[in-house]
Regions:
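Nucleotide-sugar donor-binding catalytic core of glycosyltransferases
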Residues: 1-198, 205-227, 237
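Residue-level recognition of alpha-helix termini/interfacial anchor residues
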Residues: 137, 144-145, 233, 244, ...
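Non-transmembrane alpha-helical segments in soluble domains
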Residues: 138-143, 238-239, 256, 273-276
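C-terminal "capping" alpha-helix adjacent to the active site of nucleotide-linked donor transferases
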Residues: 228-247
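Hydrophobic alpha-helical packing elements
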Residues: 234, 251, 267-268
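A short, well-ordered alpha-helix in the C-terminal region of glycosyltransferases
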Residues: 247-261
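C-terminal alpha-helical cap of glycosyltransferases
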Residues: 265-282
Length: 282
């Protein structure tokens, strides 16, 4: 029970009375807003972001509470803070007391896998594929390090006539590599969940944003191989760990253990309910 309470307090750091904003909604109003979005999108043919998975993930938990309860929320990739406590999918790790994390858009962000490939037979290389235009960090990374011999990195979208453009690579192919870069995009690195559930090791700078996965609790060189923000030491660190496979296996085991806490769906639902219950208690 202590581990559950610890996670609830991590996601929801509010411990004093607060005022809702004028935009706060009941669950019925949340539903009505979503229907308006869908009408604009499909009937009026307007370019409105549906955020359907966000809506269902919040609506399903919100529905357990009295109809008069209200909350503030913001869907999407959130990297800023709020003047009043607000339900979000992601937040900055530092100074984000008013950002209350819920497990939103889980279908995209919580993809754990069973890796059939033993670490010892994987390639002594580092892989990354992804969308680069949503992150200056990713653009810098691939433009400056695409030609490192032990890296197979590149953007698969958008398509560009540049040497760092590479074809899409499915997860099953990426799992053939011992080292997998997890580079933050619009907010967090989406691939971090499946990488940390695999028999490969996550390589990344210290994360700046977090989600329900609690990226802020990950320990460098314990749960992942830590590299500098400018990636300048990535090649040296990977070469070091290629020569020290037992150290890598320990990191992978720690990462797998961290992932295990998210696999009990009944427990995850309970934590979600308790996060909102704490929100409404103030």
């Amino acid at each position: 029970m202590q581990s559950i309470r610890s996670r609830v307090d991590y996601y929801n750091k509010i411990n004093e009375h607060f005022q809702l904003s004028e935009n706060a909604v009941t669950n019925d109003e949340l539903f009505f807003r979503q229907m308006l979005k869908l009408k604009k999108r499909y009937v009026n043919k307007k370019p409105v972001k549906k955020r359907t998975t966000y809506f269902f993930d919040l609506f399903n938990v919100f529905s357990f509470f009295p109809k008069h309860k209200k909350l503030d929320y913001k869907f999407g990739d959130i990297t800023h803070t709020f003047p009043s406590p607000t339900i979000v999918k992601s937040r900055p790790i530092v100074n984000s007391k008013n950002s209350i994390i819920m497990g939103l858009n889980k279908v995209r962000h919580f993809n754990f896998i069973e890796d059939p490939i033993n670490f010892s037979v994987k390639k002594d290389m580092a892989i990354w594929r992804g969308y680069a235009k949503n992150s200056k960090n990713r653009e810098y990374f691939i433009k400056n390090y695409y030609d490192v011999p032990i890296f197979d990195i590149g953007q698969h979208a958008p398509k560009v006539n540049k040497p760092w453009h590479k074809p899409f690579m499915p997860i099953s192919e990426q799992l053939r590599f011992k080292f997998i870069f997890c580079i933050e995009g619009a907010d967090t690195a989406t691939n971090i969940k499946w990488v940390m559930s695999s028999n490969s090791v996550c390589v990344m700078p210290e994360p700046k944003y977090e989600t329900w996965f609690m990226e802020g609790k990950l320990k460098p060189d314990f749960h992942y191989i830590s590299i500098k923000d400018d990636f300048s030491d990535a090649e040296d660190k990977i070469n070091f760990f290629i020569k020290h496979p037992n150290d890598v296996k320990k990191i992978i085991a720690n990462a797998n253990d961290f992932v295990n806490q998210f696999k009990d769906q009944r427990r995850e639902k309970l934590i979600s309910l308790l996060v909102l219950d704490k929100y409404f208690s103030y």
